[in-house]
């Protein structure tokens, strides 16, 4: 499956700067034409746009310190068309500056951000000349740490470990990789689930569930391509491991969940014609486009999951 499409691709290295136009007045019309084309033809895969202060500009040296006044409005026009964000120069403090940080902060928890490091530490880049003064020749691990810190500040959902020396140096800094696995992106956890342990067939039941996002990013369930497809769900599983009934909480919204801020919901469900017997209660984050099967991995112990991804949380006897 495709995680995302880099849905612009023009400019030097495809990073939306150092453009060449026959007529400079075509900058915005060209940008609008391309973003319209992608948004109309790719409706299920997330689309990403590089965010920076010289978007689509004919910058002679690639970058300029002064932000172009068109950049913010152009980026926000793409976001309105369903785009999310990426940046290719994390760790390059001469490029990823206050303008970029402020734009990321403005759109945190509204659209996801994807990180790619800028310094190619194993090739021609002299990363030790970075304006921050934090990097030393022969120590690419310093670059990796700065990329991680900048990513956490931007609440990124994904980190691109790239290829070659970048991949090797990330593995030599496994503490950073493990830190992102634990805390990066979104990490959705059901911290409390309350349910009846006995019921009569046909009874109306009250279910309460509390969720927390343990990651610094957010679940982008709100982006146009996902369109709120993922929802918390309960299931009753019989003794043979078969799901006999599911209940989806359409009012619960994973894109609202933030690190350190648990959110609780209460829903009433109809037990219906579930036969008498003992069942296992289970929860998941269901994919409502695929018959409510578990759709997103949860931040839970894998040993507590069924083969198809339901988290077992308790028992109920139906009389």
What are the roles of these predicted feature ranges?
Residues 178-319:
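Extracellular/luminal regions of secreted and cell-surface proteins that mediate adhesion/ECM remodeling
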Residues 16-21, 52, 61, 173, ...:
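General "foldedness" signal
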Residues 6-164:
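Catalytic-core regions of glycoside hydrolase
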Residues 141-195:
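Catalytic cores of secreted or luminal carbohydrate-active enzymes
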């Amino acid at each position: 499956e495709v995680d995302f499409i880099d849905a612009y691709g023009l400019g030097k290295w495809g990073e939306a700067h150092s453009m060449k136009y026959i007529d400079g007045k075509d900058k915005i019309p060209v940008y609008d034409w391309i973003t319209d084309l992608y948004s109309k033809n790719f409706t299920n895969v997330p689309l990403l746009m590089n965010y920076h202060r010289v978007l689509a500009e004919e910058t002679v040296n690639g970058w300029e310190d002064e932000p172009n006044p068109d950049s913010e409005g152009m980026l926000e026009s793409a976001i309105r068309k369903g785009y999310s964000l990426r940046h290719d120069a994390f760790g390059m403090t001469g490029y990823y500056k206050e303008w970029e940080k402020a734009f990321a902060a403005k759109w945190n928890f509204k659209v996801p951000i994807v990180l790619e490091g800028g310094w190619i530490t194993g090739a021609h880049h002299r990363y030790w000349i970075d304006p921050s003064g934090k990097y030393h020749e022969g120590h690419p691990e310093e670059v990796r740490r700065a990329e991680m810190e900048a990513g956490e500040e931007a609440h990124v959902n994904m980190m691109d470990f790239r290829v070659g020396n970048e991949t090797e140096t990330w593995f030599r800094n496994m503490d950073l990789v493990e830190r992102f696995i634990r805390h990066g992106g979104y990490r959705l956890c059901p911290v409390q689930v309350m349910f009846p342990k006995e019921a009569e067939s046909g009874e109306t039941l009250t279910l309460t569930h509390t969720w927390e996002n343990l990651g610094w990013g957010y679940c982008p369930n709100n982006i146009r391509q996902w369109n709120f497809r993922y929802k918390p769900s309960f299931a009753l599983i019989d003794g043979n491991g078969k799901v006999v009934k599911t209940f989806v909480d359409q009012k619960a919204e994973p894109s609202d969940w933030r690190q350190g801020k648990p959110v609780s919901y209460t829903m009433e469900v109809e037990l219906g014609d579930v036969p008498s017997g003992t069942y296992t209660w289970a929860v998941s984050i269901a994919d409502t486009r695929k018959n409510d099967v578990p759709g997103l991995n949860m931040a839970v112990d894998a040993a507590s999951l069924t083969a198809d991804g339901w988290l077992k949380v308790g028992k109920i006897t139906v009389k």
